[in-house]
């Protein structure tokens, strides 16, 4: 894998020689590329058909995603770090937030031997506004516990950037804000 892509992509997994496969949760989004066999993706008891040579973007998930076919599968699973997929599929992020449990069908005919060049061509600087609050809201609606370090990992944002933006928005550093919020009135 190209060095530049390693910042956003955890790894490429080949899924072959089996008719059923279970994708374990990893905390990041996944692009699933079907290289050959028509199959079904089962997410939260909903079934989605995946045609030959079709690719889908699957949101981060808490329970396993099952893949089923009548013959041997031939898939590639691209596992992203945190919100790394948003740098490649920014246009799909709004749909993904509206339907977080449904896969987003993205493209056809992505070839295994051209993955690095495909992702290098798709890589763009994010134009989305700073959206940590959107992530916190999503975690709240799912009833998840979280801390700021987990949110930053999901958003793929370094602590230094968060501190700078927090200071710009509030006029205070985290340390000053924390000491003020502990004062009893």
Features from the language model and the residues they span:
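Alpha-helical bundle regulatory/interaction domains
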Residues: 1-149, 155-159, 173
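Short, intrinsically disordered, charge-balanced linker/junction segments flanking boundaries
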Residues: 96-101, 179-185
């Amino acid at each position: 894998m190209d060095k530049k892509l390693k910042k956003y992509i955890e790894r490429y997994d080949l899924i072959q020689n089996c008719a059923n496969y279970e994708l374990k949760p990893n905390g990041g989004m996944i692009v699933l590329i079907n290289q050959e066999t028509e199959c079904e993706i089962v997410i939260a008891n909903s079934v989605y058909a995946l045609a030959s040579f079709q690719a889908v973007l699957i949101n981060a998930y808490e329970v396993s995603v099952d893949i089923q076919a009548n013959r041997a599968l031939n898939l590639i699973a691209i596992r992203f770090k945190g919100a790394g997929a948003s740098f490649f599929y920014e246009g799909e992020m709004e749909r993904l937030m509206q339907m977080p449990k449904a896969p987003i069908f993205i493209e056809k005919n992505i070839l295994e031997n051209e993955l690095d060049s495909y992702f290098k061509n798709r890589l763009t600087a994010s134009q989305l506004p700073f959206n940590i609050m959107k992530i916190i809201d999503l975690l709240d609606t799912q009833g998840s516990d979280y801390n700021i370090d987990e949110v930053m990992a999901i958003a793929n944002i370094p602590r230094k950037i968060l501190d700078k933006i927090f200071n710009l928005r509030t006029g205070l550093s985290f340390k000053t804000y924390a000491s003020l919020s502990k004062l009893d009135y």
